[in-house]
């Protein structure tokens, strides 16, 4: 029979709680929902209130242009567009002409809206002529007081190209640069009918005009080898070797093979008979391409001297490419394996691991003694701790823990071979 469970002090949180939620559809019952929630609660629609930025706005009084029409029309004209933003003024909507606009008085084309507010970098010529005069249009005899300046000889500038000496000592021309006024020659407007200009043949430049007289580079056609192109200094080897593409005209001869020529290609030709009885029969194994390319010339037909036995073949000697290389010795354990791709690296840095019967001494007799590696040599000597004593261990443990260990394992306290556990005879 169970007794009454002790109850603690009721907290204010428990007093305010309405108990657990009995609705099986409410799967997620939070603490706030169980404490303050009400059944069939529906939120009321409230009014939307502006944010902090909106509440800080001052009341805006809209301006109407008709307010200053009678009282102050000048001020109304100045502030008629103050309520408009810069973006709305600059990026106005597209206006397409409908044909009701009056014709323009100016016949010249006006600039677009993008260039309307462009800042003028330099003054216009019309504005400059209102203030300054052009000494080229109005000479010194036309306007009084514009006579050439008389400078004493001592104060005259003797340097070349002085700008004060131009245009009767009035400087360069009107609105032109110094180079344009001094060194630019004006082309005549009238056509050149009297001067007959003729264009001659194209000649070589100074770099290649006299290059044929060079005795070192130049090779006359008479001294060129037969079959070799004549090397002129003015013409590169690329141009002489790679000629432009010439399309067939239709009058070329058809390709015809000569009589008695072999019509089989080098890819389909099979040598079934032995060409030279002294040479061994080629093996079925694939050989290197370099061995095929650098084979000695094979005699297709013996001459009369060879048939009489008066021809002798000497010993084969290495060429200059293989004379200085170390001699290759074929290994005894790979007699059947042909070293077709023998490189200089394999000759100099050969593999010195014994193979075959030479390797049996390493594995004969079972497991060999292990040698200390680099990791074992660098490690210090580890001292083993003494054997733990169960009696000393129980003295330092809690009594409850010690009794639990001895009850579970009776051999934990003393050594099994002690006198406490006599053996049955």
From Swiss-Prot:
Residue stretches of biased makeup (Low complexity): 277-290
Main location group: other
Coiled coil: none
Organ and tissue specificity: Expressed in brain, ovaries and testis. Expressed in the tracheal epithelium and in secondary spermatocytes and spermatids present in the seminiferous tubule. Expressed in ependymal cells lining the ventricular walls of the brain.
Superkingdom as given in the UniProt entry: Eukaryota
GO MF: phosphatase binding
Ranges for region Disordered: 259-297, 315-335
A single BP term in Gene Ontology: flagellated sperm motility
Localization terms from the record: Cell projection, Cilium; Cytoplasm; Cytoplasm, Cytoskeleton, Flagellum axoneme
InterPro entries xrefs: SAXO4
GO cellular component: axonemal A tubule inner sheath; ciliary basal body; cilium; cytoplasm; sperm flagellum
UniProt cross-references to Pfam families, sorted A to Z: PPP1R32
Keywords, in A-Z order: Cell projection, Cilium, Cytoplasm, Cytoskeleton, Flagellum
Basic and acidic residues bias locations: 260-272
Assembly description: Microtubule inner protein component of sperm flagellar doublet microtubules. Interacts with PPP1CA.
Protein name: Stabilizer of axonemal microtubules 4
Annotated gene: Saxo4
């Amino acid at each position: 029979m169970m007794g009454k469970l002790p109850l603690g002090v009721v907290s204010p949180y428990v007093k305010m709680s309405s108990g657990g939620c009995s609705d099986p559809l409410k799967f997620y019952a939070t603490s706030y929902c169980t404490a303050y929630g009400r059944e069939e609660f529906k939120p009321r629609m409230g009014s939307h209130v502006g944010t902090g930025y909106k509440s800080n706005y001052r009341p805006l009084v809209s301006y109407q242009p008709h307010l200053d029409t009678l009282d102050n029309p000048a001020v109304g004209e100045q502030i008629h567009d103050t309520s408009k933003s810069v973006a709305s003024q600059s990026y106005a909507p597209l206006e397409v002409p409908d044909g009701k606009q009056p014709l323009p008085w100016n016949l010249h084309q006006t600039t677009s809206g993008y260039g309307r507010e462009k800042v003028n970098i330099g003054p216009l010529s019309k504005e400059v002529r209102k203030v300054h005069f052009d000494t080229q249009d109005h000479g010194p005899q036309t306007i009084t007081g514009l006579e050439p300046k008389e400078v004493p000889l001592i104060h005259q500038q003797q340097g070349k190209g002085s700008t004060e000496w131009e245009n009767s000592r009035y400087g360069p021309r009107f609105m032109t640069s110094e180079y344009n006024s001094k060194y630019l020659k004006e082309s005549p407007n009238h056509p050149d009918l009297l001067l007959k200009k003729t264009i001659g043949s194209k000649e070589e430049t100074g770099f290649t005009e006299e290059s044929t007289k060079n005795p070192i580079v130049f090779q006359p056609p008479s001294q060129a080898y037969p079959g070799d192109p004549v090397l002129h200094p003015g013409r590169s080897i690329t141009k002489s070797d790679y000629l432009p593409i010439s399309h067939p005209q239709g009058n070329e001869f058809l390709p015809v093979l000569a009589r008695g020529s072999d019509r089989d290609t080098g890819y389909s030709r099979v040598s079934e008979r032995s060409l030279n009885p002294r040479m061994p029969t080629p093996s079925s194994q694939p050989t290197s391409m370099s061995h095929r390319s650098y084979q000695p010339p094979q005699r297709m037909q013996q001459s009369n001297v060879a048939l009489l036995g008066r021809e002798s073949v000497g010993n084969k000697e290495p060429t200059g490419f293989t004379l200085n290389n170390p001699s290759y010795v074929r290994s005894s354990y790979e007699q059947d394996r042909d070293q077709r791709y023998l490189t200089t690296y394999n000759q100099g840095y050969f593999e010195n691991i014994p193979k075959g019967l030479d390797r049996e001494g390493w594995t004969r007799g079972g497991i060999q003694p292990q040698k200390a590696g680099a990791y074992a040599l660098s490690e210090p000597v580890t001292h083993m701790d003494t054997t733990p004593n169960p009696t000393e261990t129980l003295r330092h443990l809690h009594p409850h823990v010690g009794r639990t260990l001895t009850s579970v394992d009776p051999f934990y306290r003393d050594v099994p071979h002690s006198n406490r556990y006599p053996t049955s005879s």
